[in-house]
Curated annotation (Swiss-Prot):
Keyword field: Acetylation, Membrane, Transferase, Transmembrane, Transmembrane helix
Protein name: N-acetyltransferase family 8 member 2
Entry-annotated residues carrying N6-acetyllysine: 204
Compartment(s) of residence: Membrane
Stored InterPro entries: Acyl_CoA_acyltransferase (IPR016181), GNAT_dom (IPR000182), NAT_camello-type (IPR050769)
Xref: CDD domains: NAT_SF (cd04301)
EC number in record: 2.3.1.-
Organism of derivation: Mus musculus (Mouse)
Function noted in UniProt: Probable acetyltransferase. Has no detectable histone acetyltransferase activity towards histone H3 or H4.
Superkingdom of the source species: Eukaryota
Transmembrane segments: 36-56, 60-80
Highest classification ranks of the organism: Eukaryota, Metazoa, Chordata, Craniata, Vertebrata
Coiled coil: none
Membrane topology, record value: Multi-pass membrane protein
């Protein structure tokens, strides 16, 4: 089993963290396309239109060409959307991770294996939490595709949970995309509860891309739950 350790972010990690984030977002494009193809209006355009073309013109070539161009346009739309989101993020909190996260109340960690950064996650306090709540929000969870399925993502989430619990927060909240099925399964398996869902724009609604909200209620510091240091070192679970 490969060894790993989770540590606080350092400036030397910046380039690798940006690479992890960018590659992780690009990997979602095929899943986003598949999800959109299940929507009623997509079923009308594909395969509805090709069938109509064949019935009206008896041309399978024309129908095939239409299908190819339709899928190509979908890919371009999602690629541009992904590129814009990545560019916006790189100009926001990821532009200066130290300034954005490493303050008195937030933090950012990386998972390192064999002197290579293979995962990351951040946490910041929620600015305007519900009355009576003190919430920490989990951000930017990502693990290299070559190191998934080994428990690294779970270890990173546990790091955030322990960090928030040690500081007396009542909940850890997060948002994730509707096409990020593996992330959703991980959060729910760890005890997060889905609390909401919304679309950031009309165009995203047409694409079927929603944002899912999750919350994890933390036990009191003296009660049962996660314990021990949140920065830990050990073998990666199989």
């Amino acid at each position: 089993m490969a060894a790993y350790h989770i540590r606080q972010y350092q400036e030397k990690d910046h380039k690798r963290v940006l690479e992890l984030f960018s590659s992780g977002m690009k990997e979602l494009i095929p899943a986003a396309i598949r999800q959109m193809l299940t929507l009623p209006h997509s079923l009308l355009l594909l395969p509805g239109v090709p069938v109509t073309i064949v019935l009206m013109s008896a041309s399978w070539l024309l129908a095939t060409l239409y299908s190819f161009l339709f899928l190509l346009c979908l890919w371009l739309i999602f690629w541009i959307s992904c590129r814009n989101y990545v560019a916006k993020s790189l100009q926001a909190d990821l532009a200066d991770i130290t300034k954005s996260y490493l303050n008195a109340h937030g933090s950012f960690w990386v998972a390192e294996s064999g002197d290579q950064v293979v995962g990351m996650v951040g946490a910041q306090p929620v600015k305007d939490p519900p009355l009576g709540k003190k919430q920490m929000q989990l951000f930017r969870l990502s693990v290299s595709s070559q190191h998934r399925g080994q428990g690294i993502a779970k270890a990173l989430v546990r790091t955030v949970l322990q960090f928030a619990r040690d500081q007396g927060y009542s909940d850890v909240v997060l948002e994730t995309g509707s096409v990020q099925h593996s992330a959703q399964a991980l959060y729910q398996a760890m005890g997060f509860q889905k609390t909401g869902q919304y679309f950031v724009s009309i165009s995203k609604k047409l694409m079927g891309l929603s944002i899912l909200q999750f919350s994890y209620s933390l036990p009191f510091a003296s009660g049962p739950g996660y314990s021990g240091k949140y920065l830990k070192k050990g073998p990666i679970p199989c």
